[in-house]
């Protein structure tokens, strides 16, 4: 069974890949520090932070920060295009995560633009807060004898 953060990333990547707006995007599993213009547009899904709080002796809440980053080239309207991307990303992420029975809300959106050669490049980062209630992590039961 995959770790829950791995499942979040895979679920969101798959949902974004299925949406027509992002058909020409490269969806990265790892967000590199720099991306060349030939690779754009790109999307990345990251889970950089997870907070665990023990609710009871048998229950914890896992609050995970999930980020979706999009980078695309454009002209002076690149931020407007990213704003339109953000509406769709929010809807896709909410549908995918909530459809899996996990609490999800958009916490923050940031857009940064700069110039790469003669083109403008914009980066959108959307931060979602996901909450999962689950049992604390345990080790597998090793009481079964192993056969050599």
Where are the language model's segments positioned?
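A short glycine-rich, His/Asp/Glu-containing loop-to-beta-strand
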Residues: 39-45
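Charged, amphipathic alpha-helical segments and their flanking helix caps
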Residues: 1-35, 47-148
